[in-house]
Amino acid sequence: MLARGKTNLKIEEIRMHKHHEIHRVKPLMPALCRIRQGKKVINWETHTLTVDNNQIILFPCGYEFYIENYPEAGLYLAEMLYLPIDLIESFQKLYTVTDQIRNKTSFFLPQNPELIYCWEQLKTSVSRGFSTKIQEHLAMGVLLSLGVNHVNHLLLSYSKQSLISRCYNLLLSEPGTKWTANKVARYLYISVSTLHRRLASEGVSFQSILDDVRLNNALSAIQTTVKPISEIARENGYKCPSRFTERFHNRFNITPREIRKASRE
């Protein structure tokens, strides 16, 4: 069963009034982005994609994206749907992907009436605090409306069993905790040397994962809440606001205040 208390499934709204650019954004969970107004330009690896309110964007974990958001008539409005790995793995067990489609890459699809209907139903269930099982059932409808093969290829690119994914899930549960490699290794029931060795084999370091989680989680909070930036910094493990601003700017090439400024009319 999927439902074991509170789900990680969530929908967040991004509302901006000025053009802005954010570098090296790395989704911490598989996500869908529905543009409601304006357009988004996405760059990753050697690809560039421009998306408006006629398409849905599929963001898999494991990629870094360079993003520009452009308002239309003074407003950029988008909704992000974050999907827990458990739910997607259950979807994969229920619906089979074909190898022929698995190897194709496309990070956007046209919106369709089924998708819009299922999305609105899911959004209502989340806003009203409906049960976890109901939310997961409606999320399955959203995934089905995209097409089984697209979901499997684009949203299942990150295995729950990978050490990176396990570290993401652990750190994201309490990003403000004073995490060390030793503490994470104890939680995962492995030695710290094994942790470092296996992360290196997956092409990352412990510090890079910790930075990914804290900075991308902070970015989401800055875009979707009105919390003070200093509070967001503390919640993500940064006691010094100026240090947080420096790390944030080095990562995203934009400061927290510049993002907040873009959100004001």
From Swiss-Prot:
Record Pfam families: HTH_18 (PF12833)
Organism this protein belongs to: Escherichia coli (strain K12)
Keyword terms, alphabetized: DNA-binding, Transcription, Transcription regulation
GO MF annotations, alphabetized: DNA-binding transcription factor activity; transcription cis-regulatory region binding
InterPro entries found in the cross-reference section: Homeodomain-like_sf, HTH_AraC
Lineage: Bacteria, Pseudomonadati, Pseudomonadota, Gammaproteobacteria, Enterobacterales
Annotated gene: ybcM
Note: Encoded by the cryptic lambdoid prophage DLP12.
Name assigned to this protein: Uncharacterized HTH-type transcriptional regulator YbcM
SUPFAM superfamilies: Homeodomain-like
Annotated region of DNA binding: 182-203, 229-252
Residue ranges annotated for the HTH araC/xylS-type domain, each copy included: 165-262
UniProt record, GO biological process: DNA damage response; response to antibiotic
